[in-house]
Amino acid sequence: MAVVGLGTDIAEIERVEKALSRSGEAFAQRILTDSEFEVFQQLKQKGRYLAKRFAAKEAASKALGTGIALGVTFHDFEISNDEHGKPVLSLHKKAREIADASGTKSIHLTISDERHYAVATVLLES
């Protein structure tokens, strides 16, 4: 296996919380897929969840080499958790096309947060 792409992002949780206060659920819906939004609606710490998803999707877009541009949107990335709580990244639409074209066979995602920040790293392997 060879590294196809690597991306990291950090998000300030308070900044995301302020954006949520200003824009309400519209901001969350711009970032989250439908299934992620369902989880979001049930949480007490919505800003923390959204900051972690935002950082993960930005990291994934950087690993692809596109950023959130060139036809790649936040909805092209979906984060879920396996039965042990490990984050799992799924690619859709344009992000999936680009990953397939680059020979990506394996996707690794790690997300962490503390009081002020959420950080994520994505590794794509062939």
From Swiss-Prot:
Per the record, its GO cellular-component terms are: cytoplasm
Q: What is its EC number?
A: 2.7.8.7
Reactions catalysed, semicolon-separated, are: apo-[ACP] + CoA = holo-[ACP] + adenosine 3',5'-bisphosphate + H(+)
Record's keyword annotation contains Oxidoreductase: no
Q: Name one GO biological process term.
A: fatty acid biosynthetic process
Write one Pfam family the protein is assigned to. ACPS
The molecular function terms of the Gene Ontology recorded here are: holo-[acyl-carrier-protein] synthase activity; magnesium ion binding
Ordered alphabetically, the record's keywords are: Cytoplasm, Fatty acid biosynthesis, Fatty acid metabolism, Lipid biosynthesis, Lipid metabolism, Magnesium, Metal-binding, Transferase
Q: Where in the cell is it found?
A: Cytoplasm
Q: Per UniProt, where does Mg(2+) bind?
A: 9, 58
Q: Which cofactor does it need?
A: Mg(2+)
Entries under InterPro entries matching the protein? 4-PPantetheinyl_Trfase_dom, 4-PPantetheinyl_Trfase_dom_sf, ACPS, Ppantetheine-prot_Trfase_dom
Question: What the protein does?
Answer: Transfers the 4'-phosphopantetheine moiety from coenzyme A to a Ser of acyl-carrier-protein.
Recorded family membership: Belongs to the P-Pant transferase superfamily. AcpS family.
Which named protein is this?
A: Holo-[acyl-carrier-protein] synthase
Species, as recorded: Vibrio atlanticus (strain LGP32) (Vibrio splendidus (strain Mel32))
Q: What is the lineage of its organism?
A: Bacteria, Pseudomonadati, Pseudomonadota, Gammaproteobacteria, Vibrionales
Name the gene: acpS
